[in-house]
Amino acid sequence: MAKTSMVNRDIKREKLAKKYAEKRAALKKIVSSVDATYEEKIDAATKLAKLPRDSSPSRQRNRCELSGRPRGVYSKFGLGRNKLREATMRGDVPGLRKASW
């Protein structure tokens, strides 16, 4: 089980990313625009850098829904490898079974 402080930190990052998503997208559009002047691009890049660091979506971590484990998470199921294996062995995941050849 992951520390609750780490899980809560990720939840906080998700909220910040949603809050600043539109503002961040608008500034990125200006920075990558061909029509914007050099000064406008520098100004937009400075404003983008002043946004909270945790508002960037790339700082979010995929975590297991059950255990909160940060690594070995299958995004298709939202579960870590250990919990996915346990669920598969119980037959809770339809269409998924242990390989045998």
Curated annotation (Swiss-Prot):
NCBIfam families: PRK08881.1
Lineage: superkingdom: Bacteria
KW NAD (keyword) present: no
GO cellular component terms given for this protein: cytoplasm; small ribosomal subunit
Pfam families per UniProt: Ribosomal_S14
Keywords for the protein's UniProt record, in alphabetical order: Ribonucleoprotein, Ribosomal protein, RNA-binding, rRNA-binding
Alphabetical GO biological process terms: translation
Keyword Ribonucleoprotein found: yes
Gene Ontology MF terms: rRNA binding; structural constituent of ribosome
Protein name from the UniProt record: Small ribosomal subunit protein uS14
Family the entry assigns: Belongs to the universal ribosomal protein uS14 family.
Taxonomic lineage from the root: Bacteria, Pseudomonadati, Pseudomonadota, Gammaproteobacteria, Lysobacterales
Record InterPro entries: Ribosomal_uS14, Ribosomal_uS14_bac/plastid
Subunit description: Part of the 30S ribosomal subunit. Contacts proteins S3 and S10.
Protein role: Binds 16S rRNA, required for the assembly of 30S particles and may also be responsible for determining the conformation of the 16S rRNA at the A site.
